[in-house]
Design a protein with these regions (language model features):
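Charged, low-complexity, helix/coiled-coil-prone segments
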Residues: 1-6, 35-40, 126-137, 150-166
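Basic, Lys/Arg-rich alpha-helical nucleic-acid-recognition elements, primarily the DNA-binding modules
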Residues: 1-84
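Generic detection of long, well-ordered alpha-helical segments
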Residues: 4, 18, 90, 206-213
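Exposed alpha-helical structural elements
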Residues: 9, 27, 38, 89-99, ...
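Short secondary-structure junctions and interdomain/linker hinges
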Residues: 17, 21, 104-107, 111, ...
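Helix-turn-helix/homeodomain-like alpha-helical modules used for DNA recognition
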Residues: 74-151
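Hydrophobic protein-protein interaction segments
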Residues: 139-309
C-alpha cells in the first residue's frame, strides 16, 4: 500500500521485488557499497535512503520513482523520451542504443526473462544487423528532419561505431529467453513503400535499391527459419504471430531481472519508455490480447507460414 512517506514506499517496493530473506540486504550492500548494519538501519527506517541511493535502487530493480513518491498510474507516470538530437544525430542515436545494450548485457542471466512486441514495422531487434536496412531507417528520419542536410541515401555515411552498436542491439536479445512477436500483416509492405518512394524521387539509386532488395530477401529467409525452428540460435524460444488486423504503432515490453520496461515506438527510430509497473502490466496485456486476432506461424501453422513468406517475397520482388 502506497503512503505519503517516500522512504517507506521505497522499502515496500523493494520487498515486493526481492521477498526472500537476506536477498534484499545483499543487493543493497552490493549496489550502495555500504555495510550490513547500515543496510538494516535503512530497512528499519531509522536512516532514510538518500536521493542518490534511491536512484541507484530504482535503476537496479526497475522501480519507477513515481511509485516511490506515491503517485498512482491513474494520475501520473514517468516516461523517458528517447529522441535523437538533430544537432548530433549519430552520437545521440548511438547513446540511445548503447544505453539499452549496456543495461541488458550487464544483467545476470534470467531464465524467466520475456519480451513481447506488436509491430507495424519490422522490429529493430530483427533488422538492425543489416547495414542498409538500418541505414535506411536513419536516412528516412534524417531526411524528414528539416534541421538536417541529408541529400541522398548514398551520401549518408554511417560511423563504424554506430554500425557496431546496431549489431550489438540485435545480439543483446540472446539474454531474453522467451520472445513473442506479433506482426502487422503489412510489415514488409510498409517498408517497401518507403523505399520505393525515395527511389522514385532519385534519392536512392537503382543499384542501391537492388542491394537493399537483396538484404530484404536475406531478412525474409532469416525470419522464416526463425519461424520454422521456433527458437533462436542461442536456444531461446520465439513465437511469431501474424495479425489479421493492422496496428497503429509498435509497442514492446521487456521483463528481465526485476526490470520491467515498456517501449512505444515514435518518429521512426525513436521511442518513449517507462518502468512504471502498472503501465507495463497494461501494455503487456494489450499486446497479448492481439493474439486473438492473429495466426501463430512459428513451429505450427505450416501452411499459413509458407503462404505468409511467399507473399513477403513477392512484395520484395516488386521493389
Amino acid at each position: 500500500m502506497m503512503t505519503n512517506n517516500p522512504n517507506a514506499n521505497l522499502i515496500e517496493a523493494m520487498k515486493e521485488k526481492l521477498p526472500l530473506k537476506g536477498q534484499l540486504a545483499d543487493m543493497l550492500m552490493d549496489t550502495l557499497y555500504i555495510g550490513k548494519e547500515a543496510v538494516y538501519r535503512r530497512l528499519r527506517g531509522e536512516v532514510p535512503f538518500t536521493l542518490q541511493e534511491s536512484a541507484l535502487i530504482s535503476r537496479k530493480l526497475g522501480i519507477s520513482l513515481d511509485k516511490i513518491i506515491g503517485l498512482s498510474f491513474k494520475s501520473n507516470a514517468m516516461f523517458n523520451i528517447n529522441i535523437v538530437d538533430y544537432d548530433d544525430p549519430f552520437e545521440s542515436y548511438y547513446n540511445i542504443l548503447e544505453k539499452y545494450v549496456s543495461l541488458i548485457n550487464t544483467m545476470p542471466d534470467d531464465p524467466n526473462s520475456v519480451m513481447g512486441t506488436s509491430a507495424n514495422i519490422i522490429p529493430q531487434t530483427l533488422y538492425l544487423k543489416h547495414e542498409l536496412l538500418a541505414k535506411f531507417r536513419l536516412f528516412k528520419w534524417m531526411y524528414q528532419n528539416k534541421y538536417i542536410d541529408c541529400k541522398s541515401f548514398e551520401e549518408l555515411d554511417i560511423p563504424p561505431k554506430l554500425v557496431n552498436i546496431q549489431k550489438d542491439y540485435v545480439a543483446m536479445t540472446r539474454h531474453i529467453h522467451s520472445i513473442d512477436y506479433i506482426w502487422d500483416n503489412m510489415i514488409f509492405q510498409h517498408l517497401i513503400n518507403d523505399i520505393q518512394y525515395f527511389a522514385s524521387i532519385h534519392l536512392i539509386s537503382d543499384e542501391t535499391k537492388e542491394e537493399i532488395k537483396n538484404e530484404l530477401f536475406l531478412l525474409a529467409d532469416e525470419l522464416e527459419e526463425l519461424a520454422i525452428n521456433g527458437k533462436t540460435a542461442d536456444g531461446n524460444r520465439v513465437r511469431i504471430y501474424v495479425s489479421n488486423i493492422n496496428f497503429e504503432a509498435t509497442y514492446s515490453y521487456v521483463d528481465i531481472n526485476n526490470l520491467q520496461l515498456s517501449l512505444i515506438r515514435i518518429y521512426s527510430i525513436n521511442s518513449i519508455t517507462t518502468m512504471d509497473n502498472e503501465i507495463f502490466c497494461t501494455l503487456k496485456e494489450w499486446i497479448q490480447s492481439l493474439k486473438k486476432f492473429s495466426t501463430l506461424i512459428s513451429e505450427s501453422g505450416e501452411m499459413q507460414r509458407i503462404q505468409f513468406f511467399k507473399q513477403q517475397r513477392e512484395i520484395i520482388d516488386a521493389l
